[in-house]
């Protein structure tokens, strides 16, 4: 019986993780749950899964719900130190990191040091601090990817040697604006950007998918997870979202992992690895889908993808800067403060404000803070 903590249980990945856990009551139990601010759903989840430790990042939500949780015998906490304590609870085997942003950074690092398994659904952690996390991780042992693309690559590489890999092909649906012209992209609305053609996800990642920044972040994550140089990682647009990624080998063979666009599949694969168990999820019917198509990404219409690849290749603090600036720019777009194409423009401006420095965790956290502040200033009209 694996004892799990879920950081981000009320979000899309967290809710689907709990669905998977419910399929296998004899294999998993939930020890603690953490959420940003949805106290109502968090309490429902705690009661349903008999959880006694809970966390709310938002202080106001914490104050609102503290007594209600206490009435049910559940200890509710808040603050970054308490989130870390949650991840390090005695007897915990693994942690699903599914809160977007860098809030999972310290819990991930300390949990790895403490010998726990990380089920990585938070790509920002690896993007911002890949250089620090890589020496601590053993892929397939103490860290398992949950992202569908990285799960696909991980599955395709089973039993293979990295020396045989010619190229990783990371697929992207192309988002809701795949066929839009640059002129059309100037005036897209938040509502339009949130209509992803294939996946049901949280707001932040849905906007990242619309700008293709998400694919850029995934390329950086793949670089660190699989220790593959950027020159060997290539994005490809695949509108049907059936092939989740491919690995091309030097002998000309290409291995692809296929499945319906349903995050419960890669979540289950990570949690039950190295075994596979039957479930009640719908399966893939290729004759119903009929056609699988592929296109090259357009870097002019989707500059965020190019920025991410450039930041990845530059290394050092640049992926962390990219990630932090993007988070603030996406927040601003969702709030109606900037236009869609301005997301990448803000990120580029912030990237241009930084120079390489000596890398450590403290530096990454400082850079993350500074990049966010600069992004807010650019959005507010300062430093034009």
Curated annotation (Swiss-Prot):
Cofactor annotation: Mg(2+); Mn(2+)
Keyword set includes NADP: yes
Main EC class the enzyme belongs to: oxidoreductase
Catalytic activity: 2-C-methyl-D-erythritol 4-phosphate + NADP(+) = 1-deoxy-D-xylulose 5-phosphate + NADPH + H(+)
GO-annotated molecular function: 1-deoxy-D-xylulose-5-phosphate reductoisomerase activity; manganese ion binding; NADPH binding
A GO BP annotation: isopentenyl diphosphate biosynthetic process, methylerythritol 4-phosphate pathway involved in terpenoid biosynthetic process
Domain of life: Bacteria
InterPro entries for this protein: DXP_reductoisomerase, DXP_reductoisomerase_C, DXP_reductoisomerase_N, DXPR_C, DXPR_C_sf, NAD(P)-bd_dom_sf
Protein keywords: Isoprene biosynthesis, Manganese, Metal-binding, NADP, Oxidoreductase
Annotated NADPH binding sites: 10-13, 36-38, 122, 124, 202
Metabolic or biological pathway, per its Swiss-Prot or TrEMBL entry: Isoprenoid biosynthesis; isopentenyl diphosphate biosynthesis via DXP pathway; isopentenyl diphosphate from 1-deoxy-D-xylulose 5-phosphate: step 1/6
Enzyme Commission identifier(s): 1.1.1.267
Keyword Manganese: yes
Amino acids binding Mn(2+): 147, 149, 218
Pfam assignment, any one: DXPR_C
Entry binding sites for 1-deoxy-D-xylulose 5-phosphate: 123, 148-149, 173, 196, 209, 214-215, 218
Record family assignment: Belongs to the DXR family.
HAMAP family recorded: DXP_reductoisom
Annotated function: Catalyzes the NADPH-dependent rearrangement and reduction of 1-deoxy-D-xylulose-5-phosphate (DXP) to 2-C-methyl-D-erythritol 4-phosphate (MEP).
The name this protein goes by in its record: 1-deoxy-D-xylulose 5-phosphate reductoisomerase
Source organism of the structure: Carboxydothermus hydrogenoformans (strain ATCC BAA-161 / DSM 6008 / Z-2901)
């Amino acid at each position: 019986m694996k004892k799990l903590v879920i950081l981000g249980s009320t979000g899309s990945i967290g809710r689907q993780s709990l669905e998977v856990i419910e399929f296998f009551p004899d294999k998993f139990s939930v020890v603690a749950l953490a959420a940003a601010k949805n106290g109502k759903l968090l309490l429902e989840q705690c009661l349903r899964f008999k959880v006694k430790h809970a966390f709310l990042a938002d202080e106001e939500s914490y104050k609102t719900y503290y007594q209600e949780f206490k009435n049910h015998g559940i200890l509710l906490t808040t603050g970054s130190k308490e989130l870390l304590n949650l991840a390090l609870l005695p007897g915990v085997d693994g942690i699903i990191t599914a809160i977007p942003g860098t809030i999972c950074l310290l819990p991930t690092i300390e949990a790895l040091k403490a010998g726990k398994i990380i089920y990585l659904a938070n790509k920002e952690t690896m993007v911002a601090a890949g250089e620090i996390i890589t020496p601590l991780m053993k892929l397939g042992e103490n860290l398992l990817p949950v992202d569908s693309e990285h799960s696909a690559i991980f599955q395709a590489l089973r039993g293979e040697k990295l020396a045989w890999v010619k190229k990783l092909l990371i697929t992207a649906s192309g988002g809701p604006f795949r066929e839009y012209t640059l002129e059309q992209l100037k005036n897209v609305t938040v509502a339009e950007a949130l209509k992803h053609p294939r996946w049901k996800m949280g707001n932040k990642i849905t906007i990242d998918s619309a700008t293709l920044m998400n694919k850029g972040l995934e390329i950086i994550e793949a670089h660190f997870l699989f220790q593959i140089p950027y020159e060997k990682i290539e994005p490809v647009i695949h509108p049907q979202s059936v092939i989740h990624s491919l690995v091309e080998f030097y002998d000309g063979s290409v291995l692809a992992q296929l499945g319906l666009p349903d995050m419960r599949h890669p979540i289950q694969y990570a949690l039950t690895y190295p075994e596979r168990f039957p479930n009640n999820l719908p399966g893939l019917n290729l004759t119903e889908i009929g056609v699988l198509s592929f296109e090259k990404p357009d870097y002019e219409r989707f500059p965020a993808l190019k920025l991410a690849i450039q930041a990845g290749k530059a290394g050092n603090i640049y992926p962390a800067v990219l990630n932090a600036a993007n988070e603030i720019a996406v927040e601003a777009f969702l709030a109606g403060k900037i236009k869609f194409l301005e997301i990448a423009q803000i990120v580029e401006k912030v990237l241009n404000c930084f120079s390489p420095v000596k890398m450590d965790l403290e530096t990454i956290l400082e850079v993350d803070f500074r990049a966010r502040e600069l992004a807010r200033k650019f959005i507010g009209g300062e430093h034009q």
